[in-house]
Amino acid sequence: MKRIVLYGGQFNPIHTAHMIVASEVFHELQPDEFYFLPSFMSPLKKHHDFIDVQHRLTMIQMVIDELGFGDICDDEIKRGGQSYTYDTIKAFKEQHKDSELYFVIGTDQYNQLEKWYQIEYLKEMVTFVVVNRDKNSQNVENGMIAIQIPRVDISSTMIRQRVSKGKSIQVLVPKSVENYIKGEGLYEH
């Protein structure tokens, strides 16, 4: 049975902390396939500084190239509108029937799971992999995996704010992503 990891997020922009999460999960679980799953529009997040989705996909591909593993699953992007993880996973599972699916979330999302659409069914379809984004460690429900990662306080919001104020984002994002953001004039407003 194939082991497939899905790492969802807005990735607006993708940054060094996302890379650390991806790397730690990849090396811990050693999946057959690893997908970054950018959302078109998350139901539980505010949508400020929304940029053309192609920019986000380009920056994710730059990170994949740097990490040396991963692919992009753009199902939610193609669908457009508000994205419910349940719908995405259900469709993905139909395409990958003989696979074991792992879905990566941070502690911020773990603490909101009861708000997720069809969460009980979703828990039957995937094994949640919870990474400690806000805490030094995380206790999780039975049937879930907790992965301890080095704590790095970087957020996409912080990066967008720094760019809009003309501050450096060096090492907060890979050099290729930094150059892309500057070259395209993203988040400068």
From Swiss-Prot:
Instruction: Give the source's domain of life in one word.
Output: Bacteria
Named in its record, the pathway it takes part in is:
Cofactor biosynthesis; NAD(+) biosynthesis; deamido-NAD(+) from nicotinate D-ribonucleotide: step 1/1
Catalysed reactions, semicolon-separated: nicotinate beta-D-ribonucleotide + ATP + H(+) = deamido-NAD(+) + diphosphate
Annotated EC = 2.7.7.18
Q: InterPro entries in the record, alphabetically?
A: Cyt_trans-like, NadD/NMNAT, Rossmann-like_a/b/a_fold
EC top class, as a word: transferase
BP-aspect Gene Ontology terms: NAD biosynthetic process
- Which Pfam family is one of those matched by this entry? CTP_transf_like
Disulphides: none
Q: Which GO terms describe its molecular function?
A: ATP binding; nicotinate-nucleotide adenylyltransferase activity
Q: Key word Nucleotidyltransferase present in the record?
A: yes
Q: Does the keyword Cell wall biogenesis/degradation apply?
A: no
Keywords from UniProt, A to Z, are:
ATP-binding, NAD, Nucleotide-binding, Nucleotidyltransferase, Pyridine nucleotide biosynthesis, Transferase
Q: Which HAMAP family match?
A: NaMN_adenylyltr
Family membership, please give it: Belongs to the NadD family.
Q: What does this protein do?
A: Catalyzes the reversible adenylation of nicotinate mononucleotide (NaMN) to nicotinic acid adenine dinucleotide (NaAD).
Q: What is this protein called?
A: Probable nicotinate-nucleotide adenylyltransferase
Q: Which organism is it from?
A: Staphylococcus aureus (strain MRSA252)
Q: What does the record give as the organism's lineage?
A: Bacteria, Bacillati, Bacillota, Bacilli, Bacillales
